[in-house]
């Protein structure tokens, strides 16, 4: 099913599966998602994977996650899968808070009765998308509908001194917070730091980092784990030695998949 305009289909037969591409969840051209609806779904038990692409808050596309979208469909045929595009940051319009609002708006869309989906979500994000997944799951999900998060190389604490002293720090973070430095507004930087927003109710989290990532200091993993542990949140974290920004070696790529599947099977099957 192709959806180009605001979605006007009134019902999707729950006895059939659907893959809807470019489903609009808002009026902006970037407020689009791909959505897989499994056969025999219902609003009590059909869980939803939500995929949030990376790209420094200002680039990237849901197409980056097409392989993951298709892989989840085949591995977990009873789950729905949403692959999200969101409004990208521009020089005059930073990612925060509009991208968090977009995640909420997309979730509001799939909560409509016509989709027959439960309010149980597992978020997958890479890089900036992992940051958004964690920030939404930890700070913007008061009803605790997010049950788990897979964080791949996501920034977690933007107040980290390793980050503040990082040569490309301000250039990248401008996509998220606009033309504001840490020293100008430390409260904003804490507000958008997932590790600072962890509570005892935060969703279970599995994280992956590379030890020689040029964009993410290794302290980002330990600061997140410290916050999760302090709040008693179940989590797993893996640092791949010698690997960079999510481009794993073949054996680590295999390990990555095994660990993710095992985590989902444990908590979100």
Predicted segment positions?
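Alpha/beta-hydrolase superfamily serine-hydrolase fold, recognizing
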Residues: 2-269
